[in-house]
Amino acid sequence: LYGIQRRKLNLKHRGDEEYNFFSSVYMNTDQLKIFGFNRLVKNLKGLLVSEFLEKLKTDFKVIDSGKAVEPAKMHSFGLYIDKKWYLLEFIHELNIKNPSEELDVSILQKYIFSGILNISDPRTDPDIDFMSGILPVNNLISKVDNNEFALAFTLFPTSIEQLIRVADEGEVMPPKSTWFEPKFDAGLLIHHIS
């Protein structure tokens, strides 16, 4: 459970309970690398591939690609479906009030997952899965080609500057929007017990 849920369940909540704290590490931004966090979707919710591609054209330029698409800039996405790759380029100007709305994961969620595929909450929807951008794109391809999933999206990584803007505004990053490296496999945690 998240801290907020635990507070609601704990009628004697004081604020100094363990669930109010988490481990953290500090490092310079030039020592941190953020990779994309790719998406896999199990089905097209009854749509044919041709119908899905046509619906995408409302908000994206859909470009047939002869090779795997690993986006080179913000607001462009790779789509792998039916053994073919497409480059999707978002066609709208963003007039945003909060920085989290400009993130590629937010655009994908709003215009494709919610807008076309009826995936409203990526945290809980059983039809979506995630794969770190640190893994080879062939891993996505094999999951789609083996019919575990119907389609896959590759995303341009969230920048450190975007992450900082979201934090500075007091917002929360959307789920599965960043994959950080380095990961800390082992370490020493110190916790004062009174």
Task: Describe every region a protein language model picked out.
Residues 1-194:
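Surface-exposed, charge/polar-rich loops and edge strands
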